[in-house]
Regions:
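Conserved serine DD-peptidase/penicillin-binding transpeptidase domain
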Residues: 45-304
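Short active-site loop at a secondary-structure junction
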Residues: 22-42
């Protein structure tokens, strides 16, 4: 199986710089996900093992006597790659971090929002993925990009149910997390063949996703994972939806800073912190969503 493979290995003693073992050390190879070792090491070296990413809830405008916020709620991203991740269930779901946000908003005396919930990813630029990534990869889970406001690993899951009698197309049974209305999933999966071969097509910020390929009739149910087109919007949508469940309704639909192209003076309300860097790397062995370490200065906003 490795007859035509290219292999390169180079190991040194970091204390003496002596070579321990090398095989084709100068060969040029595509590093793939092993490059995450470099970005993770850089993260720990520059930011430190006790660094915590912060996601901050802010608002602008004033809260009147009737509990109406005459302004917007903002989710200001701090580039936390673990926010809402399934790999950190205890940290983010005991209790659920979005419900914690809702309770903080309610405790502030806000009963209505004459404005919108706005996702703010401006810590990074709008380019989620490098220009060199293959277009056919971008809609899949391994094509998920990084941004100033990430959520749910920037991935959604689609549960399909197959037709055991091989008479029809597998149907979509459930999509998680909940899908915003403007995002459309087109199902072009068919039954046939001996192996599963499915691909998700779609670009960053594009609200149409096409799931295409074949699956064996023997698979009763199966999951397909895709990249979230606009994580900042999904964060705003998820909070807005949870607020409505608690009868706190916004007059405008959720949106993002990128969509609205503006910034308002915002007042800090609550911060959501990740685990320390060392725990993220050591305890969970998470594959970071960051394709590179971006460090930028962001001026402080007025705090309460």
């Amino acid at each position: 199986i490795f007859k035509n493979a290219s292999i390169s290995f180079y190991a040194i003693n970091i204390n003496t710089n002596q070579v321990i073992l090398s095989i084709n050390p100068h060969a040029s190879l595509i590093p793939s996900s092993s490059l995450n070792l470099l970005t993770t090491a850089t993260w720990l070296e520059i930011l430190g093992e006790d660094f915590k990413f912060q996601t901050t809830l802010r608002y602008d405008g004033e809260i009147d006597a009737e509990g109406t916020l005459q302004g917007n709620i903002y989710i200001q991203g701090g580039a936390d790659p673990t926010l809402g991740s399934k790999m950190f269930k205890k940290h983010y779901y005991e209790p659920n971090f979005i419900k914690v946000w809702v309770h903080a908003i309610r405790d502030k005396g806000i009963k209505r929002i004459k404005g919108a919930v706005v996702g703010d990813p401006h810590l990074y630029d709008d380019y989620q993925v490098p220009a060199t990534w293959a277009v056919e990869d971008l809609g899949n889970d391994y094509g998920a990009g990084c941004g100033g406001l990430s959520i749910f690993d920037n991935i959604y899951e689609v549960l399909f149910i197959s037709d055991q009698n091989n008479k029809g197309q597998p149907v979509i049974f459930r999509i998680s997390p909940h899908l915003p209305e403007e995002v459309q999933i087109i199902n072009k999966v068919s039954q046939g063949g001996d192996t599963r071969n499915i691909c998700v097509y779609g670009l960053p910020y594009q609200n149409t996703r096409i799931i295409q390929g074949t699956v064996t009739p023997k698979e009763g149910s199966f999951f397909v994972k895709g990249s979230i087109p606009d994580p900042a919007y999904w964060a705003a949508y998820s909070l807005s939806r949870e607020l409505e469940k608690h009868r706190i309704k916004a007059s405008l639909k959720p949106t993002t800073i990128r969509r609205e192209k503006h910034n308002f003076l915002q007042k800090e309300q609550i911060k959501n912190e990740s685990k320390p860097s060392k725990q993220i790397e050591n305890e969970e062995k998470v594959e970071t969503l960051l394709t590179s370490i971006h460090l930028s200065y962001s001026p402080a906003l007025n705090s309460i």
